[in-house]
Amino acid sequence: MKISHIPPRLATGAFILNTGIGKLHPEEDAAKRVHDMAARTYPFVAKADPQAFVKALGAGEIVVGSVLLAPVVPAWLAGAVLTGFSGGLLAMYFNTPEMTKDDGVRPTPKGVPLAKDVWMLGAGLGLFLDGLGDRRRKRQRRKARLYT
């Protein structure tokens, strides 16, 4: 792991892990709010029990946070996981009308909590792209050794 990967992996991993742990024992009204918001963007979620959905979401967040914090996970994979996770959150943001102003991009006060997750998308893409570059450089070095 590169030293430059530690700050984004630590910041996002700890944040997501903590959020996931907090969802393992949700209160009924909080579970319903999270479930309803997710169901507006992802209609198949409406069929799930709110409590079970939020617990499963929490477990998923724990996995994502753990992947980011585990130094043995390559940067490209950690970045791909974070990009997918944050992409799902931003999809909820963009598909929930009361989250954005009339232009569909800038957040309303209700949208700020999800709009801020764009930083995780940036961190995920950065890790992913840097990790892919590392893989390419390793292959090129290996190939160069074979032909010298």
Task: Name every feature range the model reports, one short phrase each.
Residues 1-63, 70-148:
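Membrane-interface extramembranous regions
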